[in-house]
Design a protein with these regions (language model features):
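Metal-dependent phosphoester/phosphodiester hydrolase catalytic core
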Residues: 1-120, 125-127, 135-162
């Protein structure tokens, strides 16, 4: 398994629309970051590749929806290099989404507070507004991800097999 952590903030269109409110975003080199990600993913020999960023690419919730900047700039890279899971937060919900034309499992991890109300969309495998956390376990030929609510109760699990 190999983990790749990226800063998604400068890839979000909304932050570029208000430069005075988000001045640091304008200074970040997104071309360099995405080039690094492409290079590292292309060299990876890992059975399981997980990319982790703060903002979800795809999300179904009352206050948020899919992020166009990430769909344009990040998602094609994840698909090309057959990333198994993209894990994000920001939305304060549990979500597991898949796209018919993508090998990527898109996961939104919940939070310890301020749960929000997700909306089950056509690509949603699971969603919940409960607070909680996720656990990833990796074996020789299987990766399991479990969503656990704030009471410590597993509420959803999925597997990816080689």
């Amino acid at each position: 398994m190999q983990l790749f952590f990226i800063d998604t903030t400068p890839l979000v269109d909304e932050y570029h629309e208000e430069p005075s409110e988000y001045p640091d975003v304008q200074l970040q080199d997104t071309v360099k970051q995405l080039s690094w990600l492409r290079e590292e993913l292309s060299k990876s020999k890992a059975d399981f590749k997980i990319v982790i960023g703060h903002h979800p690419i795809y999300v179904s919730e009352k206050k948020r929806s899919d992020e166009p900047g990430l769909i344009r700039k990040l998602d094609p890279i994840l698909r090309k290099y057959k990333v198994n899971i993209y894990i994000a937060g920001h939305s304060h919900t549990f979500q597991h989404l898949t796209k018919k034309d993508s090998p990527v499992n898109y996961v939104v991890n919940a939070s310890g507070s301020l749960g929000r109300e997700p909306i089950k969309g056509p690509d949603t495998k699971f969603c919940s507004g409960e607070e909680g956390f996720s656990v990833v376990s990796v074996g020789k030929d299987v990766l399991k991800m479990t969503f656990i609510n704030y009471k410590g109760i597993p509420i959803y699990q999925f597997e990816i097999k080689l």
